[in-house]
Curated annotation (Swiss-Prot):
It comes from the Bacteria. This is ATP synthase subunit delta. GO terms for cellular component: plasma membrane; proton-transporting ATP synthase complex. Signal peptide: none annotated. Keywords: ATP synthesis, Cell inner membrane, Cell membrane, CF(1), Hydrogen ion transport, Ion transport, Membrane, Transport. GO terms for biological process: proton motive force-driven ATP synthesis. F-type ATPases have 2 components, F(1) - the catalytic core - and F(0) - the membrane proton channel. F(1) has five subunits: alpha(3), beta(3), gamma(1), delta(1), epsilon(1). F(0) has three main subunits: a(1), b(2) and c(10-14). The alpha and beta chains form an alternating ring which encloses part of the gamma chain. F(1) is attached to F(0) by a central stalk formed by the gamma and epsilon chains, while a peripheral stalk is formed by the delta and b chains.
Length: 178
């Protein structure tokens, strides 16, 4: 995973810097999202692994599958990535691009897993509190996991806050063992 990140970082940065310079952050976000989704399709994945195909043929196939969702600079980006035999990195590149974009926009994706369904009011209150703590605009994604017993687990980038009953019981059990 760390190796993929290391290899993908320069491509994500290059795409981000180009998009930022041309005020096309949203367009590039959409294009990279499409490329990531298409490249994860089983049929396309097999095509990209085909040793008989040249890099330019693989790039053109990917561009053809994406159709008009890629503008000329995005198509050139695909060709460059293909020339360097890095098409398998497209999902990681897209993910890293989104992180750079979120950093630029001072926003953060927050995943909240709770034991029970959170009401809209609870989600809004939690988003507001996290926004104040993180000094960023928070985009909250809520999910449910009954195995937590109670409470919530909040994930925002590298930050993890485990306020679940399951987490507290695990800590208590660990303390009793030592």
């Amino acid at each position: 995973m760390a190796e993929l990140t290391t290899l993908a970082r320069p491509y994500a940065k290059a795409a981000f810097e180009y998009a930022q310079a041309h005020q096309q952050l949203a367009d590039w976000s959409a294009a990279l999202g499409v490329l990531a989704a298409v490249s994860q399709d089983d049929t396309v994945r097999q095509l990209l692994k085909e040793p008989q195909l040249t890099s330019s043929a693989k790039a053109q196939s990917l561009i053809d599958v994406c159709g008009d969702k890629l503008n000329a600079p995005a198509q050139n980006f695909v060709r460059t990535v293909a020339e360097n035999k890095r098409l398998e990195l497209l999902p990681t590149i897209a993910e890293m691009y989104e992180q750079l974009k979120a950093e630029q926009e001072k926003s953060v994706e927050v995943e909240v897993t709770s034991a029970f369904t959170l009401s809209k009011e609870q989600q809004d209150k939690l988003a507001k509190a996290l926004s104040a703590r993180l000094s960023r605009e928070v985009r909250l994604h809520a999910s449910e996991d009954a195995s937590l017993i109670g409470g919530v687990i909040i994930r925002a980038g590298d930050l993890v806050i485990d306020g679940s009953v399951r987490g507290k019981l695990a800590k208590l059990a660990e303390a009793l063992k030592s």
